[in-house]
Amino acid sequence: MTAMMKAAVFVEPGRIELADKPIPDIGPNDALVRITTTTICGTDVHILKGEYPVAKGLTVGHEPVGIIEKLGSAVTGYREGQRVIAGAICPNFNSYAAQDGVASQDGSYLMASGQCGCHGYKATAGWRFGNMIDGTQAEYVLVPDAQANLTPIPDGLTDEQVLMCPDIMSTGFKGAENANIRIGHTVAVFAQGPIGLCATAGARLCGATTIIAIDGNDHRLEIARKMGADVVLNFRNCDVVDEVMKLTGGRGVDASIEALGTQATFEQSLRVLKPGGTLSSLGVYSSDLTIPLSAFAAGLGDHKINTALCPGGKERMRRLINVIESGRVDLGALVTHQYRLDDIVAAYDLFANQRDGVLKIAIKPH
């Protein structure tokens, strides 16, 4: 008789439901992880709304914290019963894309089925959980290429302390890294949701000495100060572009990080940049963008626009855990609510509608 588990699955736009699914069978390079904590991401809400397409019946979620239940025969250096995380991005690090430095765009595992070209590049395909394969909002998840993608959790850290590592922390910090921040730089971070807050923390670690955090929620701006923001601006109370230009003496910021994914925030991120500055884009956009010529100096302003998909792999996760363990960053304040997996539909309703001051929800299957 097939062993079954509970899982949150995409049914159709507007509907994610709890369903019974078979516990995954693993291959020699895989691991089966029993989920102890996972969470809901803004990207999951895009999936819920039908703004990002996935297959019907797919288990959603991409942020796993759990315990190794079973290891494939080729996976070494780990043990059953060990607490681990895996990145939201689980590439095959032998692929062209990974060796080219863009492991998040690795679609090499799709080549045999004809879904990817001969060199294995496919946009966003390195993001497998809840996108290309069944995800983490379930009692169990299959981790592919486990040797390269599992990272042990130190005994002294709780699930909640490392819950941001697989995606939100990795993405936010990548936004700061992509902003080309140098010691003494001034940085504006647009939107202080979970990713923006992590980008604010990452900008501080990268050496920025003046960080301007922008949002329309005063509570989130208070948290931004704890994450390292020196100045907070509520866009409901001021003209953000004017204020940033005043704060910089008309020079503009060295870098801006866009962490929402709207035309308005993208455009503002450009307008506050100094000539030669960098816009680091983290938002997931749902419609075409327009670049205003005046903000972009008609393409002649030496501006740089960098985009990124959350980096993954066990070494990335290890370094993020090191940051948490060092005490330099505490992301515990981002976990504002806890739900059982059985109540996942209610958790989505809360998160998608941004009620009750929600930032991140810890989902507990057991």
From Swiss-Prot:
Residues at which Zn(2+) binds: C41, H62, E63, D167
Q: What top-level branch of life does the organism fall under?
A: Bacteria
Gene Ontology molecular function terms on file: (R,R)-butanediol dehydrogenase activity; alcohol dehydrogenase (NAD+) activity; aldehyde dehydrogenase (NAD+) activity; zinc ion binding
Keywords, comma-separated and alphabetical: Metal-binding, NAD, Oxidoreductase, Zinc
The note describing how and how many cofactors are bound reads: Binds 1 zinc ion per subunit.
Q: What class of enzyme is it?
A: oxidoreductase
Looking up Gene3D superfamilies in the UniProt record yields: Medium-chain alcohol dehydrogenases, catalytic domain, NAD(P)-binding Rossmann-like Domain
User: What does the record give as the reaction this protein catalyses?
Assistant: a primary alcohol + NAD(+) = an aldehyde + NADH + H(+); a secondary alcohol + NAD(+) = a ketone + NADH + H(+); (R,R)-butane-2,3-diol + NAD(+) = (R)-acetoin + NADH + H(+); an aldehyde + NAD(+) + H2O = a carboxylate + NADH + 2 H(+)
In its keyword annotation, does this UniProt entry include Oxidoreductase?
Answer: yes
**What SUPFAM superfamilies does this protein's entry cite?**
GroES-like, NAD(P)-binding Rossmann-fold domains
What cofactors does this protein use?
Zn(2+)
PROSITE patterns assigned to the protein according to its UniProt record, in alphabetical order: ADH_ZINC
This entry's Enzyme Commission designation comes to 1.1.1.1, 1.1.1.4, 1.2.1.3
Whether Calcium counts among this entry's keywords is no
Which spans of this chain does the record mark as coiled coil? none
One Pfam family from the record:
ADH_N
Q: What does this protein do?
A: Multifunctional alcohol dehydrogenase exhibiting NAD(+)-dependent dehydrogenase activities for 2,3-butanediol, ethanol and acetaldehyde, and reductase activities for acetoin (NADH-dependent), and diacetyl and acetaldehyde (independently of whether NADH or NADPH is the reductant). The rate of oxidation of 2,3-butanediol is much higher than for the oxidation of ethanol. Has acetaldehyde dehydrogenase activity leading to acetate formation. May function in the release of excess reducing power in the absence of exogenous hydrogen acceptors such as oxygen.
Quaternary structure and partners:
Homotetramer.
Q: What family does this belong to?
A: Belongs to the zinc-containing alcohol dehydrogenase family.
From the Swiss-Prot or TrEMBL record, give the protein name.
Alcohol dehydrogenase
Source organism? Cupriavidus necator (Alcaligenes eutrophus)
Encoding gene (name): adh
